[in-house]
């Protein structure tokens, strides 16, 4: 359950380290985001001399949440942190590597490039 003002870790090598959610995209009444949702974020912490600077407004896709996700077979999955991957306007990742596991729900939402770069898919 990612909402406005939530801080997210960055799970790629784009240069950002921490993000703060400005808006969850997907409709006027969409309050919460979960795995696979696109959010608009502000970069709160970044690596020096990277393409992404502190204060930049970026789009990101949520790849891990601490709040459990119920799957259609009745199982639940949750992660140790809230994390996102920075994407461009074509929904392609801005970084070239993904760190940590990502949820299988990303494949169903069409983020195949992120799934293929991830070391583990849960």
From Swiss-Prot:
GO terms for biological process: translation. InterPro entries: Ribosomal_uL14 (IPR000218), Ribosomal_uL14_bac-type (IPR005745), Ribosomal_uL14_CS (IPR019972), Ribosomal_uL14_sf (IPR036853). Keywords: Ribonucleoprotein, Ribosomal protein, RNA-binding, rRNA-binding. The keyword Ribonucleoprotein applies. GO terms for molecular function: large ribosomal subunit rRNA binding; structural constituent of ribosome. SMART domains: Ribosomal_L14. Pfam families: Ribosomal_L14. One of its GO terms (cellular component) is cytosolic large ribosomal subunit. PANTHER family: 50S/60S RIBOSOMAL PROTEIN L14/L23, LARGE RIBOSOMAL SUBUNIT PROTEIN UL14M. NCBIfam families: rplN_bact. Part of the 50S ribosomal subunit. Forms a cluster with proteins L3 and L19. In the 70S ribosome, L14 and L19 interact and together make contacts with the 16S rRNA in bridges B5 and B8. Belongs to the universal ribosomal protein uL14 family. Binds to 23S rRNA. Forms part of two intersubunit bridges in the 70S ribosome. This is Large ribosomal subunit protein uL14. It comes from Thermotoga neapolitana (strain ATCC 49049 / DSM 4359 / NBRC 107923 / NS-E).
């Amino acid at each position: 359950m990612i909402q406005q003002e939530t801080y997210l870790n960055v799970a790629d090598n784009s240069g950002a380290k921490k993000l703060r959610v400005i808006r969850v995209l997907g409709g006027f009444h969409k309050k919460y985001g979960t795995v696979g949702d696109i959010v608009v974020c502000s970069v709160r912490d970044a690596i020096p001399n990277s393409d992404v600077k502190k204060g930049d407004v970026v789009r990101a896709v949520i790849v891990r949440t601490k709040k459990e996700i119920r799957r259609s077979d009745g199982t639940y999955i949750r992660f140790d942190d809230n994390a996102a991957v920075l994407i461009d306007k074509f929904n392609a990742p801005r970084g070239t590597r993904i760190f940590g596991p990502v949820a299988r729900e990303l494949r169903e939402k069409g983020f195949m490039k992120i799934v293929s770069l991830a070391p583990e898919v849960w």
